[in-house]
Design a protein with these regions (language model features):
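Actinobacteria-biased recognition of intrinsically disordered, low-complexity terminal regions
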Residues: 1-12, 158-163
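Generic structural hydrophobic/aromatic packing signal, biased to beta-strands
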Residues: 10-12, 52, 89
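Glutamate identity and glutamate-enriched acidic tracts
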Residues: 3, 16, 21-23, 31, ...
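Charged, compositionally biased boundary regions
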Residues: 81-163
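Compact, well-ordered interaction domains used in eukaryotic information-processing assemblies
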Residues: 2-5, 18-19, 24-82
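Phenylalanine-focused residue identity feature
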Residues: 9, 59-60, 73, 135, ...
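Conserved hydrophobic/aromatic positions in well-ordered beta-strands
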Residues: 12-13, 63
């Protein structure tokens, strides 16, 4: 089992009555992809549910649930060498875990258009994922602001991290 840190969180985003809602999920759900998907499916939204998961200072995952369909994005596939959640995302996507010699760069993987209908295109998502000056929580906060649920996201992160 990988150590959970204070910078780990899983925030569920969904719309209710045309208002973005954000809910902190127990950080324990980040221990497996099945737990993340199961927790997101329990939410009351009749539309899309988005999970924004930060794992330490290393990487983030975006999970999007629409009915029975699951779309996934991981900010750095090389995280799969050390982190079970990233490895499970790659397995779900049918992408091989990289070899050690492939670990010299940040490589996003998955559905690059996962947020395109919300105003974040593939190029922007890749650029933010590859920005080595930003931590995963900062990238997710930036995405939340751009999409329009920044304040709700910030409150949920504060709740999740005990701030």
């Amino acid at each position: 089992m990988t150590e959970v840190t204070s910078s780990d969180f899983c925030i569920a985003i969904y719309r209710e009555d045309d208002v973005w809602e954000a809910q902190a999920l127990p950080v324990a759900v980040t221990e497996s992809l099945d737990a993340v998907i199961g927790a997101l499916r329990q939410l009351p939204s009749i539309g899309v549910v988005i999970g924004l998961i930060a794992v330490g200072d290393d990487f983030f995952v975006i999970a999007r649930i629409v009915g029975s369909q699951v779309s996934l994005f991981v900010s750095d596939l090389t995280a799969s060498v050390d982190w079970p959640l990233a490895r499970e995302v790659l397995e779900h996507l049918d992408i091989d875990v990289p070899y050690d010699e492939d670990l010299d760069q940040v490589l996003p993987a998955g559905d690059l258009s996962i947020l395109a209908d919300l105003g974040i295109d593939e190029m922007e998502l890749c650029a933010l994922s590859g920005d080595l000056d930003l931590f995963p929580d900062e990238v997710l906060a930036s995405l939340a602001r751009r999409i329009g649920f920044g304040p709700a996201f910030d409150r949920a992160v504060d709740e999740a991290t005990g701030q």
